[in-house]
Amino acid sequence: MQRYDYLKAIAADAADIKDALVVSTGWASREWWAVRPSDGNLKTRTLGLVSSIAAGLAIALPQRKVIAIDGDGAFLMNLCGLPTIAKQSPGNFIHLLFDNEIYEASGGTATASRHADAVVLAKGAGYRNATWVKSLEEFRVEFVRAWQHNELTLIAVKVEPGQPKDLPPLKLDEIENKYRFMRYLEATEKKGILNPGFDSKL
């Protein structure tokens, strides 16, 4: 199965997922946007930043669910961030890892993930809840459990490369996305980010 199949499943399983903040990169950003269009989605261009940005959001906004949609290449580029995330252990942070063993967005070069165990790496860094799943049903069970419980969780799954042929393009770049995301936070959290004097009633 492909990553898109799993993303569609979690969007259906979590009734209030529309309120979650979701950080992603690469093709996963387009796929998630097709599943759940929202200004609560943040796309990062640089591999390796997804988990740290998502963890920072989770720490700053403990009342919000935050999801990181990570890939194996990006995950391996930020191993140094795992101990920090585990030390802070934000319970509202769900870390999803889709491992297709390639850098898909940049041409399909193989990653080193087939020679490393992401769950072992996460547990070694201090994640108490980290697991591999082998099917869509297992993935759904683990995701719902993580969604309902307040504990830092990594869910990892091997997926086939590829995307749907009819996947719609993203009609905004990272700059516009960033500002829309911040305005979304200002509106939903009733706090100023760009303007400390922000008035939520305006």
Language model: regions and residue ranges:
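Short acidic, glycine/serine/threonine-rich loops at helix termini
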Residues: 32-36, 106-110, 166-170
